[in-house]
Amino acid sequence: MASVVLIGTQWGDEGKGKVTDFLAEKADLVVRYQGGNNAGHTVVAKGEEFKLHLIPSGILYEDKTCVIGNGVVVDPKVLLEELAYLSERKVKTGKLLISSNAHVIMPYHRLLDALEEDSRGEHKIGTTKRGIGPAYMDKTLRIGIRIMDLIDDEEFAAKLRRNLQEKNNLLTKVYGVEPLDYDAIYQEYSGYAQKIRGLVADSSLVIDESLKAGEKVLFEGAQGTLLDLDHGTYPYVTSSHPIAGGACTGAGVGPTRINRVVGVIKAYTTRVGEGPFPTELADETGELMRQNGHEFGTTTGRARRCGWFDAVIARYAVRVSGISDFALMKLDVLSGFEKIKICVGYRVNNEVIYEFPQSQKIFKACEPVYEVIEGWQEDITGVTRFEDLPKAAQDYVRRIEQLTETQVTLIAVGPGREQTIVRGEIF
């Protein structure tokens, strides 16, 4: 038995898709445990680029089984579109299973998400308007429609009718928009149910049987630590738990079954949407990072905000998820910078703090305290051994290890599978 949880350690967009794809080669089962199609991951395989939002990255291996766990909220329309997209690209995909306990994103979730965000005015939280938050709200309120309900005609009809009555009251009386039509939604989603029925399974049981058989299981998180509902930069967070602990509840597996936690971390820092960002660079340096790193959202296309590496955030991620290894991404993007900065602490109210603050009011007031180290000019995209990196690049990696007390086991020097420096085994 071997199981690894793969998480994002910043605000998402760290490059988890590439690492999942890289590690999936040795895994038997790849499990997505939270989030929905608000998260995008890009994978480059055999020179081809694939952009996915809901289906686990491991689907590109035809001998793997991929699982969408109970902690995921599933938009069946998007799911079927992604399967069609892979088919059109003539990809021989692996087996896909969907948890019967996963909740379904309905049309009213998407509509309410957009209406609520627009009503916030200057207090917007940066939602993708894909219905993720409202779907999780219904789950918490215990009125949500699960995959098992969707494929049961009688259950689906009854639950849809009850939900739509409530949601249409909200839409017409609070937001002043037209009500949604029951028959249209029922017909549309019944069609989806027929197409996904054969994929539905007790995912927790599938995972348990795989682990008992001695197989290797990779749990794939979406978003990142600082978007976690409890441990992120609230309220600028997602509605689920991207941290390692989320794998247990979102996949139905006990914590003693987890062997390692790999934190995917970018060699610099990015953020999409609203919220404080101490190391953000609103200058030519930040723009150069954005262009060199192609920092535009997979899901929204929005330009990502860019800044220097923040070791305070990295240490915090290690603490809340028990990270055993880092996968350091996009080291090649920093080639060409004469000097490179690392944030080692925050200055706030004439005091320097070295731990991530719980208060967003304090975090918003934080100014970065930097260490400045030498950069490197060499192109490192073809380097395959750590020892062959420029000395300055090696020193940069070692300094991150020192500041976080965590080993950097994988280093990405380009988007391809083969552009990965391996310094130790994960599985």
UniProtKB/Swiss-Prot annotation:
SMART domains: Adenylsucc_synt. One of its GO terms (cellular component) is cytoplasm. Its EC number is 6.3.4.4. One of its GO terms (molecular function) is GTP binding. It catalyses: IMP + L-aspartate + GTP = N(6)-(1,2-dicarboxyethyl)-AMP + GDP + phosphate + 2 H(+). IMP binds at D13, E14, G15, K16, N38, A39, G40, H41, T128, R142, Q223, T238, R302. It is an enzyme of class 6 (ligase). It is found in: Cytoplasm. GTP binds at residues 12-18, 40-42, 304, 330-332, 412-414. Mg(2+) binds at D13, G40. Its cofactor is Mg(2+). HAMAP family: Adenylosucc_synth. PANTHER family: ADENYLOSUCCINATE SYNTHETASE (PTHR11846:SF0). Plays an important role in the de novo pathway of purine nucleotide biosynthesis. Catalyzes the first committed step in the biosynthesis of AMP from IMP. This is Adenylosuccinate synthetase. It comes from Desulfitobacterium hafniense (strain DSM 10664 / DCB-2). The gene is purA.
